[in-house]
A protein has these predicted regions:
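Metal-dependent amide/peptide-bond hydrolase catalytic core
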Residues: 1-176
């Protein structure tokens, strides 16, 4: 049997996993069979790296927001219309740095597992119109044209600027 368990926090995941182990043991006893548990991987929450996030936010603000052409805005609205979302176009803003939610919504990611081993800094870049469902044809369509390209180039610049800061500032590295 293959199973996957999820929880918003690592401690909660451990408790759920212990329950799964008990269920497997009980099921094996009822069926009078042997069983073996193999843990393949985990998907834990991402540990917040506030110092790294602040360093990256500084570069995001220094670079400024992405500007979009009228044609890109029109395309974004067509994507929103096709996916049943309000036709507001694509935002050209820089959001302020916010505290990470205690239990952030969204899917699981193995980035959380990585964050338990090495510091992780995450950046969200606009590559599709607001409200576009991720893992959909609409995001793929935007990624293959200037909206997605601008977002990735912008993100690349911000990441590079942050890496230069880390290279130049050993204290920043140790604080992260």
């Amino acid at each position: 049997m293959w199973t996957r368990v999820r929880d918003g926090k690592r401690d909660g995941l451990v408790e759920v996993w212990k329950q799964v182990e008990k269920i497997a043991e009980g099921a094996a006893m009822m069926a009078n069979v042997d069983y073996k548990i193999t843990l393949i991987s985990g998907v834990h929450e991402v540990l917040v790296n506030e110092t790294g996030a602040k360093a990256m936010q500084k570069n995001l603000e220094a670079l400024g927001a992405i500007s979009y052409t009228e044609e890109e805005q029109d395309y974004a609205k067509k994507i929103q219309e096709a996916t049943g979302k309000p036709q507001v176009g694509i935002e050209s803003i820089i959001s302020p740095l916010e505290k990470t939610a205690e239990f952030p919504m969204g899917g699981s990611t193995d980035v959380g597992d990585v964050s338990y081993v090495v510091p992780v800094i995450r950046l969200r870049a606009t590559t599709a119109p607001k409200g576009t469902p991720w893992h959909s044809w609409a995001v793929v369509a935007c990624g293959g044209m200037s909206i997605g390209h601008k977002g990735m180039r912008h993100a690349s610049k911000i990441l590079a600027m942050t890496m230069v800061d880390l290279y130049k500032d050993p204290k920043l590295v140790s604080d992260i």
